[in-house]
Every structure is written in C-alpha cells, then in structure tokens.
Amino acid sequence: MQLSNYHSHCTFCDGRSIPEDFVRFAITHGFRAYGFSSHSPLPFETFWNMSKDDMPEYLQEINRLKQKYSDQLEIYAGLEIDYLDETYNASIPYFQELPLDYRIGSIHFLPVSERLVEENMVCIDGSFREYAHSVERHFEGDVRLLVKRFFDTTMKMIEAGGIDIVGHMDKIYMNGQKYEIFNFEEDWYRKPFEAFLDLVPEKGLMVEVNTKNWTKKKELYPRVEYLSRMREMNIPVMVNSDCHYPDLVNDGRKEAFKLLKQAGFKSTRELVKGKWQDIAL
C-alpha cells in the first residue's frame, strides 16, 4: 500500500496543527510522500481559507520542511483552490504564478450573484441546517436544482483548467442525500454526474478518493459505487485523507485501497521526486 497524502490542512487555514506536526506523524507511520494543500485565498474572508498575506509564509514554511526532512519524506507544496466563477479560479494568474507542486480544484461555494462576497455564497460543505436553508432560499426548496448548479459549476471548473487534481468530486451528496427525493439513479443526478465524469479524462486530470468521512459515515468522495466506472475510463486516482488533525492523516486509507482493488484498479497516481507516476497497489 502506497503511503502518501496530498490533501491536508494545517494552521495556515482551518487545520488544527502546525505543518511540522503532520510531517512528524507521516514519518513515524512510514509515509513516503506528504503534500500540504491549504484552502486558497478567496476574494472574501472565511474562517477556513488562507489569506493572501499569509501565502509567502506558507510557502516558506513548506520549503523549510522539505529541506529539513529531505532524507526521510518527500514533502510537497500544494493548494486546494476554489472555483467561484470565470474570474476567480485556479487558472487565474495569481494561482498559476505561485511556485506550487500541484493544485487541487474543489467546489465549496456556489455564487448566487455576480458579486463575490460571502453573503452571496451557498456553502455545500457545511452543516445540513445551512445547506437546507440555502436550498429553500436560493433553489425554490428543490435540492435537485442545487445539484444541477453544483455539477454545472464543476464542469466549468474543469473547462477553466489550471488544476491537476479534482477534489471531493461529488461532495454535494454529503448533505443532499438527507432529502427524501434524493436518488443517485435518477436522471437529474446521474446524467450531469456522468457528463462531468466523461470530461475528467478528456482534460487529463487526476481524481482523489477522499476518505475524510469514511470513519464517521463510511462515505467516500467519489461514492464507492463509481469506482468501477472510473477504472473502466482509465481515470488516474490517489487516496487522500483531507485531514485537519495529524492523527487523521491515515484515516480510511487501508479501506479505500481495498475498495480500489475490488473495483479493478492496479495503481494509484503518486508524486515521486516531483514527477507524477503510476505506482502499483
């Protein structure tokens, strides 16, 4: 089993420990590679995103750790970058000019107005109460409309480019599945998801298998049921824990690798000495 993790949050965003604590855990548990992917700056403040002012220090600290632990662990500097709209996403010069090893593209917010401020954002990754309030207020009480907006926006993110990895690709279902009407097999969910999935290999992207909620909810993003389809499409994958605490770095990894093997995967995509390679499971 390949011990690596490329989706990780530290105290530069909403993580609960300093970067070095994650590095020490990774080394102690035999990891070969470890990547940091703090939540990128946004055009508005949130409690979980890094500020632009902190970016130089973030990059400096990750580079310091790279040098300090170079004989024990491959350490990489990444970002998890939100797609908001065509004016603010991973493809804009600010993010492309940063000296990063990789970029994860994710959807946490869906704008409901052209003005990119927090009050105009629907957060899909928070509490169900907040999610349900947004469905009522902005989507006529119909979760299907929110799902459509999510996948439409995800398609735009992929078309915009500037990313290497698609993060928690279907996390819209985390809260959405609590609605009685929610059905993964009906066309309103299945068709936009499959259209999005078809676009991933066309753009040459990797997809993470996100294990953040495996221990608590037995959920992966993408859903376990989609892994076989992704294998048939030759979509390269990696297993990431999306951890915010050092002791959760390895959460769900063993189970995810078992599920990947059952789905027919023979390898995962990994950074080896700075280059993406397929490593046998």
Tell where the protein language model's regions lie, with residue ranges:
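An N-terminally biased module of ancient metal coordination in phosphate/nucleic-acid-related enzymes
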Residues: 1-85, 89-97, 101, 173-187, ...
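Hydrophobic residues within beta-strands of alpha/beta enzymes
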Residues: 34-36, 103, 166, 207, ...
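Active-site-adjacent C-terminal substructures of enzyme catalytic domains
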Residues: 187-249
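Extended substrate/RNA-proximal surfaces in nucleic-acid metabolism proteins
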Residues: 55-202
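C-terminal functional module detector
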Residues: 152-155, 160-161, 225, 257-263, ...
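A generic hydrophobic-segment detector
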Residues: 9, 131-141, 275-281
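Conserved residues at the C-terminal ends of beta-strands
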Residues: 37, 106, 169, 210, ...
